[in-house]
């Protein structure tokens, strides 16, 4: 079904969106380059997302990122690799992130970030079952490369964080060849992310968060989440994607260095009622290379 929708859409202009994440609060560097190095040590994460499980050609996403501060000069560097697949289309992004941080107060930090990105696009039109022959869908696209740039700003202290970013600024056009060209345009995605950490008591922390994503040609996406952390070990939460899905989240801090997070989404649209749609699943592993010498003075919860 998704493959047929892709064929129908490709005749006109497609507004491509970035990958979707439910556990964005643990994967901020993927959408905001200014986050690179903000954890104060080398941090790496792996994420896998299977969306609309059971539907043929449904989206899947794999993400790897690694970032770290460099010395004591306020500079941070990061590397991200994102692989997206939907129907016959596969996209891979290779990102290099640079950030520079200034102190705004004793606890406050303001970071500015730049992203350099390379994009590889594969479209296997030969895998589609076409009812009618279409000349524009006869030749596969293999490893079509396009560069891009992005930018962001990120502020945080021990309790609060907020960021604004555009991971990909250039609007790349695809499928331009032929006498009657059709296009898929990679649009700018604007992100606003914010959150706070409240101590409800000595053992329970409340962590609300918000992500807003705006892209031309698509509905405004607003994700609101609420997580509760117990004894800085176990995390339980829920989220709502406006007019789209409800989510449940659970996380485990195996140690001060190692986090495991799981999420399940259920659509509230007609797609969620589809008999072959079992929902969306997401898992993230994050490891912080914290020095074993001494104690971590100010643990980060975002």
Language model feature labels by segment:
Residues 16-302:
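Subset of outer-membrane beta-barrel
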């Amino acid at each position: 079904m998704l493959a047929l929708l892709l064929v129908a859409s490709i005749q006109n202009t497609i507004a491509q969106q970035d990958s979707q994440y439910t556990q964005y609060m643990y994967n901020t560097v993927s959408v905001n380059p200014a986050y690179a190095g903000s954890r104060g040590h080398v941090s790496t994460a792996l994420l896998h997302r299977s969306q609309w499980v059971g539907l043929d050609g449904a989206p899947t996403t794999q993400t790897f990122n690694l970032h770290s501060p460099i010395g004591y000069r306020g500079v941070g560097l990061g590397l991200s690799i994102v692989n997206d697949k939907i129907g016959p289309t596969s996209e891979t992004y290779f990102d290099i992130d640079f950030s520079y941080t200034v102190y705004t107060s004793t606890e406050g930090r303001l970071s500015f970030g730049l992203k350099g990105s390379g994009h590889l696009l594969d479209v296997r039109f030969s895998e589609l079952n076409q009812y009618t022959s279409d000349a524009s869908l006869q030749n596969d696209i293999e490893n079509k490369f396009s560069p891009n740039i992005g930018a962001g700003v990120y502020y945080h202290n021990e309790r609060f964080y907020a960021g604004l970013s555009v991971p990909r600024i250039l609007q790349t056009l695809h499928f331009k060849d032929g006498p009657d060209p059709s296009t898929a345009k990679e649009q700018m995605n604007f992100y606003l992310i914010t959150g706070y950490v409240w101590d409800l008591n000595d053992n329970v922390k409340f962590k609300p968060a918000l992500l807003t994503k705006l892209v031309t040609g698509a509905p405004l996406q607003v994700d609101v989440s609420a997580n509760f952390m117990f004894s800085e070990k176990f995390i339980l939460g829920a989220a709502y994607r406006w007019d789209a899905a409800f989510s449940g989240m659970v996380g485990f801090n195996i140690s001060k260095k190692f986090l495991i997070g799981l999420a399940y989404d259920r659509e509230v649209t007609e797609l969620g009622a589809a008999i072959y749609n079992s929902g969306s699943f997401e898992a993230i592993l994050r490891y912080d290379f914290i020095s074993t010498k001494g104690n971590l003075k100010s643990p980060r919860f975002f």
